[in-house]
């Protein structure tokens, strides 16, 4: 069975929501009309973050230019320095220079850090959502997508962005309509994927994949990312492209990590075409997959 799209909406585990027996909120809004009427304020990514993301796409960018842009945002600067001084990058001496930190981390890793921090910061608090859990699961999906992309044939950065942002539509709905979110979700357990999208459609008049795709388009991320997220709760077709296969697989692995599945159980939830890229003897996962999954289990938040 293929694991569907999995935004990590985590509540107290009292009972599991089932769309067919969950009462609908008496007021169903029209999200698109509310945007047109100025009643919905979509999250905005800080200008400095947008500038950094654009600059970091240039493989020949001057690291001093990046350092100068970073210095405009003390929070991001602190995160970059903390990462540069972490055990992952050696951590043998205290590094206080942002230029040196940028050189050490590298532009690709820095771009992902800036994107993750900028996106998470743009949402602030969301009533009823366990944001640390949400962003940790999103980061695991993003990391999984990044690692899967080369074998599946997807563009690496598009895969990472898709994994990171795939559940943001749910945050937007809950932040925009907190009364409906409270009515529908309070007191219920984890709700994921197509099940969550069905409940959202019934109560909000739209689901998180469509909201997330709309937001991604407004902030100027690549169209393939928006299209892939828009289709993420639909049944996976035989003609699914590399980016869609990568996102579905990444979400399956993020859900497996949340359930504390063993590697073999996580592997069994991948689409067959992706399993074939990592298959060992007898249909079991190979050493590369086991190493990938172990790394996902050890993922620490950097937001």
PLM region spans:
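Conserved alpha-helical "signature site"
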Residues: 1-192, 196-269
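C-terminal appended segment following the main domain
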Residues: 252-303
């Amino acid at each position: 069975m293929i694991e569907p799209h999995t935004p990590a909406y985590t509540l107290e585990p009292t009972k599991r929501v089932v769309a067919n027996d969950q009462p609908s909120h008496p007021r169903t809004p029209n999200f698109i009309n509310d945007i047109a009427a100025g009643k919905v304020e979509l999250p905005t990514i800080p200008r400095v973050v947008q500038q950094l993301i654009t600059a970091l796409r240039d493989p020949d960018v001057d690291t001093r230019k990046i350092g100068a842009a970073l210095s405009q945002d003390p929070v991001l600067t602190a995160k970059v320095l903390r990462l540069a001084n972490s055990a992952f990058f050696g951590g043998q001496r205290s590094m206080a220079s942002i230029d040196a930190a940028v050189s050490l981390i590298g532009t690709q890793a820095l771009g992902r850090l800036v994107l993750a921090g900028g996106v998470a910061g743009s949402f602030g608090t969301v009533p009823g959502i366990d944001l640390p859990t949400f962003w940790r699961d999103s980061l695991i999906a993003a990391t999984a997508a990044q690692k899967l992309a080369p074998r599946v044939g997807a563009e690496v950065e598009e895969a990472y962005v898709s994994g990171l942002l795939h559940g943001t539509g749910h945050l937007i709905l809950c932040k925009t309509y907190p009364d409906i979110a409270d009515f529908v979700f309070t007191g219920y357990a984890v709700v994921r994927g197509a099940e969550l999208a069905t409940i959202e459609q019934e109560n909000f008049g739209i689901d998180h994949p469509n909201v997330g795709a709309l937001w991604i388009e407004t902030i100027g991320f690549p169209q393939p990312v928006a299209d892939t997220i828009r289709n993420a709760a639909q049944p996976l077709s035989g003609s699914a492209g590399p980016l869609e296969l990568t996102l579905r697989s990444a979400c399956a692995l993020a859900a497996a990590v949340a359930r504390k599945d063993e590697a073999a159980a996580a592997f069994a939830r991948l689409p067959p075409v992706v399993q074939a890229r990592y298959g060992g003897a007898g249909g079991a996962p190979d050493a590369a997959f086991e190493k990938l999954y172990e790394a996902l289990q050890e993922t620490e938040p950097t937001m």
